[in-house]
Design a protein with these regions (language model features):
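N-terminal Rossmann-like NAD(P)+-binding subdomain of aldehyde/semialdehyde dehydrogenases
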Residues: 1-125
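Conserved C-terminal structural/oligomerization subdomain of aldehyde/semialdehyde dehydrogenase
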Residues: 22-29, 212, 250, 346, ...
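Residue-level signal for inorganic ion chemistry
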Residues: 24, 60, 82, 104, ...
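Short, well-ordered beta-strand elements within core beta-sheets of diverse protein domains
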Residues: 27-33, 48-54, 138-139, 249-252, ...
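Structural signal for hydrophobic packing residues in well-ordered secondary-structure cores
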Residues: 49, 53, 68-75, 79, ...
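Rossmann-like NAD(P) dinucleotide-binding subdomain of oxidoreductase/dehydrogenase enzymes
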Residues: 116-259, 287, 382
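A short hydrophobic/small-residue beta-strand
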Residues: 163-165, 340, 422
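ALDH superfamily catalytic-core signature
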Residues: 223-362, 425
Length: 469
């Protein structure tokens, strides 16, 4: 269903389905927005903009807070929908809802700190700074965090006075529609937030629509590159890209074998590796301790149970296509000279559930620098800490990196040298603070980080000099 002007309407475009990735059952059916409907959705957002933007921050915030109260009240329902539609285990789905609920306070603080008003009185003049909303912003959501990541754009955009067209992932329409239901119950004025299902054609149309002022996208580098090409014709529009990573986890100078293996395991395999910050590459010292860590990691992987849903550490990959691409990626690595430590395979009777892949890439003839969205870890051994840093940087991505070490003095040179936007010590690569920016460099984005800095691309500054005649 489409949602605009506070009304629900069936789409007139191509039909599509949401499929439970664990068992293959069809759990939702609907249609994309037609071109005519999409124009109506954008018009709805445009007509609502000035009325929303001219409300005081206090009034806008009161409605937004009501949405968060409703989300908290209905968090069990949201958790169930996320788990059903993405395949996440319930604890992982509940964690996403918790992360979304924590977004409000950080967004308000960021708005006031980074895009609020400011007055500086000097001897002969006053300098004034205000911020204005852009207008209609289109949020293109991902499947892996269908609530939390779109919400990371939507909340700061609404706070700043923008109106929203939300185009969710085709894999998670139920979560999107329930999110819209809660926003409607919160009492947002008609047209302030709108929902349009669709695929590439809908996204392309939103990019080119004259009334749409920006695209806030979370997803793969390949799609982000396509969006950049389209938006090159519209340099006056905002484009914020939150893309993927080929993230390294470096282990150096630690005797805590079990603790290191636990951090590596969670970094690589949480959410079946379907987080942009998951560790993709493990860089170990070429020592006895390095080999002990690898052996401990192998034991943890082999101990995983895939017998029943209640036993799962992680859920399935999002689709049959994703599963096929994951397994093909594994074969590509092996064809290039990588060696199997533990080979991933599909779990019988579980549709898109796969076992983890542990691959030694030491002898590869050519590095394959791509983000592989699944439970795979590529293992390398190095002789020096500088060699570990060099290998960590041997990627065109730059989202997340981690260092595990008993020697904390190594962290400062690691942070200074490693090209990534999120760098953690003795923590998972997937850990990030909502009070800081979230983003990377290179193929991981276009230097418009989300998180605390999302406020920056949701408003534009007006600087004034005020003098007396």
């Amino acid at each position: 269903m489409l949602y605009f002007k506070n009304q629900w309407m069936p789409g007139d475009g191509r039909s599509f389905k949401s499929i439970n990735p664990l068992n293959g059952e069809v759990i939702w059916e609907g249609n994309f927005a037609s071109n005519k409907q999409l124009n109506a959705v954008v018009k709805s957002a445009s007509q609502a903009h000035l009325g929303w933007a001219h409300q005081s921050l206090v009034k806008r915030l009161s409605v937004i807070k009501k949405f968060y109260r409703l989300l908290d009240k209905n968090k069990e329902t949201m958790t169930r929908l996320i788990s059903l539609e993405t395949g996440k285990i319930p604890a992982d789905a509940a964690s996403e809802v918790g992360a979304a609920l924590a977004k409000l306070n950080n967004s308000v603080l960021a708005y006031k700190k980074r895009t609020g008003s400011q007055l500086d009185s000097l001897e002969s003049m006053t300098a004034s700074l205000e911020h204005s909303s852009h207008g209609v912003l289109s949020v293109i959501g991902p499947f892996n965090f269908p609530l939390h990541l779109p919400n990371g754009h939507i909340t700061p955009a609404l706070l700043a006075g923008n109106t929203i067209v939300f185009k969710p992932s085709e894999s998670t329409p139920m979560v999107a529609e329930y999110t819209m239901l809660l926003w409607s119950q919160a009492g947002l004025p008609d047209g302030v937030i709108n929902l349009a299902h669709g695929g590439k054609d809908v996204v392309r149309a939103l990019c080119k629509h004259p009334t749409n002022k920006g695209i806030l996208f979370t997803g793969s580098y390949a799609v982000g590159k396509q969006l950049s090409k389209i938006m090159a014709d519209y340099p006056e529009k905002i484009l914020a890209l939150e893309l993927g990573g080929n993230n390294p986890m470096v282990v150096w100078s630690t005797r805590k074998i079990n603790a290191a293996a636990d951090l590596i395991f969670e970094s690589a395999f949480i959410s079946s590796g379907q987080r942009c910050t998951c560790a993709r590459r493990l860089i170990l010292p070429n020592t006895k301790d390095g080999k002990k860590i690898l052996e401990r990691l192998k034991k943890k992987i082999k101990a995983l149970s895939f017998v029943s849903p209640e036993d799962l550490y992680y859920g399935p990959l999002i689709s049959s296509k994703a599963t096929d691409e994951f397994l093909k990626f594994q074969e590509k690595l092996l064809a290039l000279g990588a060696k199997t430590i533990l080979k991933a395979k599909k779990v019988k009777g579980a549709f898109n559930l796969v076992t983890p892949s542990l691959i030694n890439v030491q002898g590869m003839t050519k590095l394959f620098d791509e983000e592989n969205f699944g439970p795979m870890l590529q293992v390398s051994f190095v002789d020096t800490f500088q060699g570990a840093i060099d290998l960590a940087n041997n990627t065109k991505f730059g989202l997340a990196a981690g260092l595990i070490s008993d020697n904390q003095t190594l962290f400062k040179p690691f942070v200074q040298a490693v090209n990534a936007g999120i760098i953690n010590l003795n923590s998972t690569t997937t850990g990030a603070s909502g009070a800081f920016p979230f983003g990377g460099i290179g193929r991981s984005g276009n230097l418009r980080p989300a998180g605390f800095y999302a406020a920056d691309y949701c408003a534009w500054p007006k600087a004034s000099i005020i003098k007396k005649l």
